Structure formats: C-alpha cells, structure tokens
Amino acid sequence: MAQPTSGLYSTFGFFICLLFFPASWEAGANTFQELQKTGEPPKFDHLLPLTQGLTHRASSDQKTSRQHPPDLPEATATQKAKNQCNTTRLVKPVHTPLDNAKAADYGNTTVRHEMPPASEKDLSSQGKHLMARNERSADDPRSTTSENGSDGKRLTSAPRRNTSCMPSTRRTSLTTKSGMRASPMGASASLRTTSQKPTTFHVSELIRQSSSPVYATETPRTSYNTLKTLTTSGPEHHTIPFASDKSVQITTEHIKEATSASEITRTQSTFTKYEGKTSPASESSSQAQVLPIKHHTTSASENTIPVSAKSTPSTEKATKPTASPTVFQRKTIVATKTVRATRTSERTPVFLETTQPAKATEDKSSTVPSHVHKTETMHQGTVGSLTSRTNLGLSTSEAHYPQQSTHSLPGGLHAAGETGENNSFPVWAIVIVILMAVIILLVFIGLILLVSCASRARHVLTQNSEEPEPQPEDKGSRNSYPVYLMEQQNLNLNQIPSPP
C-alpha cells in the first residue's frame, strides 16, 4: 500500500508542478510585454521580483502623466527612478486641482502634488549642486546616466536618505512625465551597476536621481510658461479669427460708411459748388444746350422733307401701273360671268369675244409693260390645256373663247388657273387609283394562270380515259413479261450454254 500512495503523491505533485509552470510562464510573459511597452529592456537577474512594483508604477505614472501637457520635456533621471524604486506605495500624493489662472501663472497642469516636509528639506539641501547637472540632463540623456552613476558611487554611505527616497521618487514620477521618453540605455546601465553594489548604493543613487528632477521641474517651468502661452494661444487663435473677422467686417462697414459718407459729402460739396456759381452761368449753359438742338432738329426736318417729297412721286408712279391691272381684273370678272352664261346661248359669247379683247389690247398698248406679255405667253399653254380638260362637253366656240380671254387679260389667266387647280384630283386619290389598277391586273393574271392549269389537267384526264385497258397477262400472271425476263437473266448468269 505504501508504494501506491507514494506513486499517487508523486503524480499529484507532478501535476501541481505542471499547473504552476504555465502560470509562472504567463506571468513572466506579461511582465516582459509590459516592459516592452514601457520601452525598457527585459532583465532576468535579481530585478525580477520587482516587476510587479514596476508595472504598477508604470500604470500609475501613465495615468498621472496624462494630466500633464505633452510639450514638457522629460528628464531621464525620473525614468530611472520610476523603474527602480518599489517601495513608493507607502506615500500617496494628494491631488488638488488648481484654478485656471493659477495654472497659467505657474505653467503647470491642474494637478498639484503635495509632499511631506521631510523630503523637501532633504531635497533642498542638494539643490545647488544639481542645477548644472539637470541642465546637462535636458540636453544629453547619456551624460545624465554617466553622471548619476558616478555620483551614486560617491554617495554610497547615505543611510539617512533612505527615508526620503520614497516621496521624492513619487514626486518625480508624478510631475516630470510627458510625451518624451528617456533613453533606456541609461536605465539599463544604472541597474547593472546597482546589481554589483549593495542596496545602500542603490537607494543613494535613487535619492540622487530623484532629487535632481525637483529642480528639473522648476527649470522647465519657465520654458513651460512659454509653452503654456503657446498652447493657450491655440484657443485664443481660434477665438481671435472670429473677433478679427468681426473687426474686419466692422472696419469694412466703417470703410463703406466712410466712403458713402465721403461720397455724400463730395456730392454735397459739388452741389454746393454748383449752387455757389452764379445763375447766369447756368442760364448760359442751358441756352448753349438748347441752341444746337434746335439747329440740329431743323436741319434734320429739312433734309427729311425732300426725301419724303421724292418718295411720294415714286409711289405715285408705282401705283399708276397697279391701278390699271385692277381695271383689268374687274373686266375679267365680267368676262367670266359671261362665259358661264354662254353655255346656254352661243350668240352672246361671239359678241363679247369681239368687243372685250379689243379693249384689253388697247389698255395693254398703253400701260402694261413688256414682261407682262411674256408671262401671259408662258401661261397660255397651261391654262388652255386645263380648260380643255375640264370643258370637254362645251362647244367649239366656248373652247375657243377662254383662249382669247387668256391672251387678252392677265387676270383671266389667274382665274382660269384657279379653276383648273380646283378641278384637278389630289395626289392621294391618284395613288389610290394606281394601286387599284395594279391589284386588278394581278387578279386578272392569276385568273388566267388558273384557267390554263385547269385546262391542262383536264386534257391529261381525257388522254388517260381514252387509252385501252391492259390485258390479263400484263396484270401480273405467271406467264407475265417481267417473270420471263427474270428467268432469262438467271439463266444467263448461272448457266452458260455449251456448244452442241
């Protein structure tokens, strides 16, 4: 029984070790990742038990550093002190918000960190020696690490300053945090030197490093005031353009008002100047303006009057030849009336033919120009053809009379043309007639083809009926002709007759 129990204990212990190993591995990985986030190289020597304190310090310092402006430069010594001291949890700073006016005066953020008086006394004793060293640390981080290391070696015997390490480092970690990161090389070098030295040397170096940022925060205060003014100028810059726009608008309005006022005053002054002039001058100017207008108007009227006088005789001349065609139109109207009346009697149109064309010829010789004769001769054939088409049922005298009237009068030409156009068919009617004629022709051609085909078929039927009926041998009996031929073919192919 002892062997199984020992085996169970060993297996149980082995399982516990297996469970503890991943937990420790995860804890180490978390600390390594947090060290990488803070920008510090991992260290796996005697500083490993301090990782939890370092992580808590880094998180608390990051929370407090968010309250500080990003433009404030960070001292490298505060970065080292923040990474090395693990007993700073004992002292907690008191955050008291300041007013905006005080923050603008002191150049700090709205968080003030109160410290115990003991640490301030210890730090004030070292202030004079650390001013020059802090100025160097602001310029070169490597020089700060080397100086801090050398000073730490000198201040090894400082057991009394062990008490002031905690609050001083806490103050530096809270007040001197900004967007700038210190180089991790100095921190690593200081930690390597402390690993070879006792803890008193480590504490004294931390005191030395933590006491320096007190004045580093005071020295950037002057620079931070300038930066504060620059940062405060940002919202002022945002508000100033609005004020400047207003001022610009106001000034432009004032300028416009001033210009309008100046224009008004100028116009008023001009009016006063004109009013200050004597009245006879204004009268003379008005007279000088009136006189040329009178002269110009009279000359224009005189010039236009003869133009109108010249134009009137031309219009009279133009109206004279137009008056004569009106007379012809009246006469032609009478002639057309008589033509319609001549359909009943044949004697009256003969009398009108001899009288009215004579009058028309006399008028032509007197008034109508030569181009009218040409136009009449051009329209003779067309009008005569139209009248001949429309008046097919008239007598020879009636058909001859419109031709003489067209020879005589141009008005008669227009009247006859109008009558011919009215009697003519429209285009769509002509198209329809042509289409109907084509369709009728096609129908006739189709009928002719059908008749011819029917006659041929009938002829074939008659020929078939006239042929004699076939004999019974031809209908397919045993002695029919095709069977005989088949027998002969078989004999010729299979049996060749031999000679006798």
From Swiss-Prot:
Topological domains annotated Cytoplasmic: 451-500
Query: For bias kind Basic and acidic residues, which ranges apply?
Result: 58-71, 111-123, 132-142
Stretches of the chain found on the membrane's Extracellular side:
28-429
- Where in or outside the cell is it found? Cell membrane; Cytoplasm
The molecule here is called Mucin-like protein 3
| UniProt KW keywords | Cell membrane, Cytoplasm, Glycoprotein, Membrane, Signal, Transmembrane, Transmembrane helix
Which residue ranges run through the membrane?
A: 430-450
**Region annotation (Disordered) ranges:** 55-198, 275-324
Q: Does the keyword tRNA processing apply?
A: no
Q: Which domain of life is it from?
A: Eukaryota
**Per the UniProt annotation, where are the glycans attached?**
N108, N148
A cellular component term (GO) from this record? Answer: plasma membrane
General function of this protein: May modulate NF-kappaB signaling and play a role in cell growth.
Q: Which residues form a coiled coil?
A: none
Query: Which residue positions does the secretion signal occupy?
Result: 1-27
Compositional bias annotation for Polar residues: 76-89, 159-178, 279-289, 298-324
Membrane topology value:
Single-pass type I membrane protein
| Disulphide-bridged cysteine pairs | none
- Check the record and name the PANTHER family matching this protein: DIFFUSE PANBRONCHIOLITIS CRITICAL REGION GENE 1 (PTHR22094), MUCIN-LIKE PROTEIN 3 (PTHR22094:SF0)
